[in-house]
């Protein structure tokens, strides 16, 4: 469950909304509650194979289509971090304004948790997490801007709590 989660692996569909467009991506996420993460892009083709890794100290981006392939010492990116379920859990636990609601989707009944994202960023202000009541796994995570508009939607396809991560999955090469 979320309370006892030490890490997770998932595949998901990510939708990013900007002023007049929306972009969809396939992603894989690997995350440890101690903060290390890896996010791989699986689609569309022009970004497939790109990934970002945080080893606990440094963020590194890898792009197989670029000479040199690796960008080290990437600045911390609040919006990118918020795409991880672990960040939602930390925000939810620390948030003074949280809410819990019940929702019925086409497939199942869900519990919806809402949290405020610290830092007063107008693009990432609040977030909601839908959890399937039967499987107790995340269904989707939505991040809203300060006007309540959807900025990011992560729709989980496959989700695994506390996986055995491959050695080196969070290493920066």
Predicted regions and their residues:
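A short, sequence-level motif marking secondary-structure junctions
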Residues: 30-32, 55-57, 74-80, 157-161
